[in-house]
Amino acid sequence: MALNLQDKQAIVAEVTEVAKGALSAVVADSRGVTVDKMTELRKAGREAGVYMRVVRNTLMRRVVEGSQFECLKDTFVGPTLIAFSMEHPGAAARLFKAFAKDNAKFEVKAAAFEGELIPAAQIDRLATLPTYEEAIARLMATMKEAAAGKLVRTLAALRDQKEAA
């Protein structure tokens, strides 16, 4: 279906607005994936706070121009599905990585985080970022472990001091 100028401007405006609030972006080629599988992916994306859209490459180049995602310009070749992570930087990468594992025809092209291009081979860097809750839990576990270790060392020092006396 041909898009007129107003439709193109509306798409660019919508996706640009989403890109401004996004933490990261992932670009993939969804050629050969069934409609049912894509529907499942979109549903999982909505639940994970990921905005997904298939947009013409020329329009996507306009969207990313001057933004933190400008490094993705060269990946807009062929059928392109773009996903913006709105709540957590690794959400879209995790979603696409898991989907690609189950669907051989789905290919992740690249990702962008804080203006840095992350090639598809290194997508794990972004996908394995802990969520805010996971990071807090790890920090608390480390702090708790350090306090317990300090207590054990203090008790051992007291024991050694009493044995020496």
From Swiss-Prot:
Keyword Ribonucleoprotein: yes
InterPro entries noted in UniProt: Ribosomal_uL10 (IPR001790), Ribosomal_uL10-like_sf (IPR043141), Ribosomal_uL10_bac (IPR022973), Ribosomal_uL10_bac_type (IPR047865), Ribosomal_uL10_CS_bac (IPR002363)
GO molecular function: large ribosomal subunit rRNA binding; structural constituent of ribosome
Pfam families: Ribosomal_L10
Single biological process term from Gene Ontology: translation
Gene3D superfamilies: 3.30.70.1730, 6.10.250.2350
GO cellular component, one term: large ribosomal subunit
Functional summary from the UniProt entry: Forms part of the ribosomal stalk, playing a central role in the interaction of the ribosome with GTP-bound translation factors.
Annotated family: Belongs to the universal ribosomal protein uL10 family.
Protein name listed in UniProt: Large ribosomal subunit protein uL10
Organism: Edwardsiella ictaluri (strain 93-146)
Lineage of the organism: Bacteria, Pseudomonadati, Pseudomonadota, Gammaproteobacteria, Enterobacterales
